[in-house]
UniProtKB/Swiss-Prot annotation:
Residues 1-168 are annotated as: Cytidylate kinase-like domain. It catalyses: GTP + AH2 + S-adenosyl-L-methionine = 3'-deoxy-3',4'-didehydro-GTP + 5'-deoxyadenosine + L-methionine + A + H2O + H(+). Gene3D superfamilies: Aldolase class I, P-loop containing nucleotide triphosphate hydrolases. This is S-adenosylmethionine-dependent nucleotide dehydratase. The gene is vip60.
Length: 476
C-alpha cells in the first residue's frame, strides 16, 4: 500500500495549492523541497534561498546535498504529500503524479498569484523549464517530464486546483484498493434503542471484551474512516446498533464524503429528525430504513420497537419516507423475513414508498450474536421463497438468503476491526488502527462472487451523490 503522493511538474501547475488540498482531504502532511531548501540554507549556511541558489551554481554538489537530505527525511515517514520534481526518482512507496500546463496558462497563473520574484513571460518560463530539465538530466540522468515515470499524468489547463486534487485522490485510492469488494459496512455503534430479538449484529461480545461503551472514541472512529477511504473503498455504510445514537455521526459522514466515498446509513428511523435530514443532505447520499412489518403487534413480537415496547406506527413510517424523499436522499428499505412476518404482504407499502432498493433478507442465525432467541424466528427456505413469490412483481426487490448473506459483506465492528460471518459466526481481525487495513484484511473470508451475485454492485452514484469537494480554490 502506497503511503505517499509525490507531485512533479513545471512552474504554474499549482503543485503547492494542489498538495495542500490533498493534505486537507487525506489528513497527510504536506512537504515541499522548496520549503525544505529555504530552512536548510538558513539553518546550515545562514543564507537566504536566493543566496543559496547562487551558491549552488558555483557548487553544484549543494543541490545533491539537499536532494539526499530531503530524500532520507521523506522516505523515513508515511502519509506525506510531497511537492518534489524528483519525487518519482527518489521517493519510495509513493504514488507519483506529473502535472502539466501550457506555457500560456502557467504565465497567467504566476501573474495572478503576484509572485514578484518569478518571471512571467512565456519565453522566460520556457527557458526556466528547459534549464531545470537539463540540470536534472546532467545530475541524475533522469527526465522528470517523461510520462512513463508516473502513475498519473494530468493536464491542468482547464481544471481548478480542487479538481486536480480530487482526481489525484480518486486515482490514489483506487491504486491502493486492497479489497476487491468496493463497499464496506462500519458498525460503529453497538448500543441500540430497539430490541430486535433476531438481531445478528448485537456485538455484546465486542462490548464485553474490547469497548465497554460499545464504540470507539470519536477521533479513532474518524481515523478508521480515513483509512477505509485511503484503502480504496468506494462506498461506506454506517450501521449499528443504531448509528443515529452517535453524536459525531455527522462528522464521520462528512469526512467519508469529502474523501470521495458514497455514504449511507442504516437506521430504524426512530431518531431520524428533520434537523438531521436538513443538516446532512450535503454529505449523506443514501438512507436505509429497517422496516420488517407495518403491524405494530408483529413489531412488538419481533422487538422492533423502542425499548422493545413502543413500535413505530404505519403513519410514522409513511411520514418519514416522505421526508427522506423531500430532502432528496436515495431511499433503501431493509426487511428481515422471519417467522412473525413471512406471511405479510408489503407490496402496496413498497409501491407507495418507492425505494430505489428493497433488500429482503432471510433471518440469519449467527452463533454468539442471537443464539438464545433465534429459534423462534427462523424460517425454512420454502417459507422465505413464499414471501419472495408474494412480492415477485416488486421491481426493486433484492433478495438475500442465508447463503447469499454469509461471507459477502466487508464489515467493521464497533472496535474498529474487520469481521466476517462466512462460517455462521463472527470472525474478527486485529484492529485496523494497530495493523492497518491490508494486514487486517488478510484473515478475513470475503467472497467476491457472492457479493456480485447478490447485487452488491449497483448504481449507488445517484444524482444525490455529487462531488461536494469542489469548493473553488485559486492557484497560488
Amino acid at each position: 500500500m502506497k503511503t505517499k503522493i509525490t507531485l512533479s511538474g513545471f512552474a504554474g501547475t499549482g503543485k503547492s495549492t494542489v498538495g495542500k488540498r490533498i493534505q486537507e482531504q487525506l489528513n497527510f502532511e504536506f512537504v515541499s523541497v522548496g520549503n525544505y531548501s529555504r530552512q536548510y540554507a538558513m539553518e546550515k549556511y545562514g543564507l537566504t534561498i536566493n543566496e543559496f541558489q547562487e551558491q549552488c551554481k558555483a557548487q553544484p554538489e549543494l543541490d545533491n546535498e539537499i536532494d539526499e537530505k530531503f530524500r532520507l527525511e521523506c522516505n523515513s515517514k508515511e502519509n506525506l504529500v510531497i511537492d518534489y520534481r524528483l519525487g518519482f526518482h527518489f521517493i519510495k512507496n509513493a504514488f507519483h503524479v506529473l502535472l502539466k500546463v501550457s506555457d500560456e496558462s502557467a504565465s497567467k497563473r504566476i501573474r495572478l498569484a503576484n509572485r514578484s520574484d518569478e518571471v512571467t513571460s512565456t519565453k522566460a518560463i520556457q527557458q526556466r523549464n528547459q534549464k531545470m530539465r537539463d540540470r536534472f538530466q546532467d545530475n541524475y540522468g533522469v527526465d522528470f517530464t517523461n510520462d512513463k515515470n508516473y502513475d498519473l499524468v494530468i493536464d491542468t489547463d482547464d481544471l481548478t486546483a480542487n479538481e486536480v486534487a480530487d482526481l489525484i485522490i480518486e486515482h490514489y485510492q483506487k491504486s491502493n484498493a486492497v479489497s476487491k469488494i468496493p463497499s464496506v459496512n462500519f458498525h460503529l455503534w453497538q448500543p441500540c434503542n430497539m430490541r430486535c430479538k433476531f438481531c445478528f449484529a448485537t456485538f455484546l461480545d465486542v462490548k464485553q471484551e474490547y469497548v465497554p461503551k460499545g464504540h470507539l472514541p470519536e477521533d479513532e472512529a474518524l481515523e478508521v474512516v480515513r483509512k477505509i477511504a485511503a484503502a480504496g473503498f468506494e462506498k461506506i455504510t454506517f450501521a449499528g446498533g443504531e448509528p443515529l445514537l452517535c453524536k459525531w455521526l455527522p462528522k464521520l459522514i462528512k469526512t467519508a464524503k469529502q474523501l470521495g466515498m458514497t455514504t449511507m446509513i442504516v437506521t430504524n428511523g426512530s431518531k431520524l429528525t428533520d434537523s438531521f435530514l436538513k443538516e446532512n443532505k450535503a454529505y449523506l447520499d443514501w438512507i436505509a430504513v429497517s422496516i420488517d412489518s407495518l403491524d405494530e403487534e408483529n413489531n412488538i413480537k419481533i422487538g422492533r420497537a423502542i425499548t422493545g415496547k413502543k413500535p413505530l406506527s404505519k403513519a410514522f413510517y409513511y411520514d418519514l419516507i416522505d421526508k427522506i424523499h423531500q430532502y432528496g436522499y436515495g431511499l433503501k428499505i431493509n426487511t428481515v423475513v422471519n417467522k412473525v412476518n413471512y406471511k405479510d404482504n408489503l407490496a402496496s407499502f413498497i409501491a407507495k414508498a418507492k425505494p430505489k432498493r428493497w433488500k429482503v433478507l432471510q433471518v440469519l442465525p449467527i452463533k454468539g450474536q442471537n443464539d438464545n432467541k433465534i429459534d423462534a424466528f427462523k424460517i425454512t427456505d420454502e417459507e422465505y421463497a413464499n414471501f419472495l413469490d408474494t412480492h415477485k412483481d416488486v421491481e426493486t426487490i433484492v433478495p438475500e438468503s442465508n447463503d447469499e448473506i454469509k461471507g459477502s459483506y466487508v464489515m467493521v465492528d464497533p472496535a474498529g476491526r474487520f469481521f466476517d460471518n462466512a462460517a455462521g459466526t463472527h470472525n474478527y481481525s486485529k484492529p485496523i488502527l494497530e495493523v492497518g487495513i491490508q494486514e487486517a484484511l488478510k484473515t478475513m473470508n470475503y467472497d467476491l462472487d457472492k457479493f456480485l451475485n447478490r447485487g452488491g454492485v449497483y448504481n449507488w452514484n445517484t444524482n444525490k451523490n455529487q462531488d461536494l469537494r469542489k469548493e473553488e480554490v485559486s492557484y497560488e
